[in-house]
Swiss-Prot record:
The chain crosses the membrane at residues 1-21, 50-70, 81-101, 111-131, 151-171. Catalyzes the transfer of an acyl group from acyl-phosphate (acyl-PO(4)) to glycerol-3-phosphate (G3P) to form lysophosphatidic acid (LPA). This enzyme utilizes acyl-phosphate as fatty acyl donor, but not acyl-CoA or acyl-ACP. Its EC number is 2.3.1.275. The lineage of its organism: Bacteria, Pseudomonadati, Pseudomonadota, Gammaproteobacteria, Pseudomonadales. It comes from Pseudomonas entomophila (strain L48). This is Glycerol-3-phosphate acyltransferase. It catalyses: an acyl phosphate + sn-glycerol 3-phosphate = a 1-acyl-sn-glycero-3-phosphate + phosphate.
Amino acid sequence: MFWSLALLAYLLGSLSFAIVLSRLTGSPDPRSSGSGNAGATNMLRLAGRKLAILTLLGDLCKGMLPVLLARQVGLDPQEQAWVGICAVLGHLFPVYFRFQGGKGVATAAGMLMALYFPAALLAIGAWVLTFYLTRTSSLAALIATPLTLPLLAWREPEALLPMTVLTLMIVWRHRSNLRDLFAGRERHF
């Protein structure tokens, strides 16, 4: 059952709401415009608030649904987390869009909402506060994601290994943003 859910999660994660919505509305392809990222922040820049919110909700749901399904069929928290990571991998490397996806932050947040909601609240709160103070989405994601690890180590220790892997994936996916942050070139809102 685990492998079937992992594959299903990857395929669901591969549905890029940013790309689909941009095609449906005639908006620029987020992979070749703005920051080049197929995610909600770039959709906000390119297509406005409405499409950004729809992208965010779609990306949250595709992270959340596989984990909830994994829980429903009786997988343990670690297996649920690995299934959720498969959804994030789908977002990062979508099979339907030549493996050119987003950075996985919203999909990871949806996964975390289903896995352990207090950790998701911590991450979302840290993201909002950091974004409010810096107006920089990438920095907010890079600060918020690792903050969940101590709470998970304490309350959901069996999910700590996959969540550490997830954190490393998100940091790796933001490597160009890190270079821009250190060089003072990162985009702000």
